[in-house]
């Protein structure tokens, strides 16, 4: 269990986090130089990180990654996706220099519109399962997202990945 290992092996965990952070920096530099219009940091397991570790394990690596990108002259916008941290998005947006933040489908879109900083572009957050349901319920969900975010920068997207059952 990775979380137990994090608790039991402080120094080794920090070393691993440093390796992953540096690899991410290298990868994103290559993506940017290859012509990517925007860069996205997927932290799909952010919700598994206990709140008191979030600064060290989620926020500080993002700070380091974006600082390194800017130090390399990379100007593309960076979107962070700390899946499942709910109201922790406030600290994430305030403490990291992300240009945008991905919202998973569990985030209340009205809360996000009212509480997250307006200078940060929001991305998401249609429930991927709504694509399977389709029809009027899917259209209502789409309309709710578009309505809540009509007056701020927004990238319409799913709140997480497409499932294998999704029709083509």
Name each model-derived stretch:
Residues 1-168:
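Active-site loop segments of alpha/beta catalytic cores
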């Amino acid at each position: 269990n990775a979380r137990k290992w994090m608790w039991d092996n402080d120094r080794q965990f920090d070393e691993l986090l440093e390796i992953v952070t540096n690899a991410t920096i290298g990868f994103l530099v290559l993506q940017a130089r290859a012509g990517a219009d925007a860069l996205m940091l997927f932290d799909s397991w952010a919700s598994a990180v206990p709140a008191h570790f979030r600064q060290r394990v989620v926020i500080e690596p993002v700070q380091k990654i974006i600082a390194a990108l800017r130090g390399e002259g990379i100007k593309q916008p960076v979107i962070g996706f700390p899946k499942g941290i709910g109201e922790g998005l406030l600290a994430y947006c305030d403490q990291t220099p992300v240009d945008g933040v991905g919202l998973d489908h569990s985030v209340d879109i009205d809360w996000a519109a009212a509480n997250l900083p307006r200078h940060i572009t929001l991305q998401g957050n249609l429930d991927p399962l709504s694509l399977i349901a389709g029809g009027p319920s899917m259209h209502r969900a789409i309309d709710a997202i578009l309505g809540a975010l009509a007056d701020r920068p927004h990238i319409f997207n799913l709140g997480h990945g497409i499932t294998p059952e999704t029709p083509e």
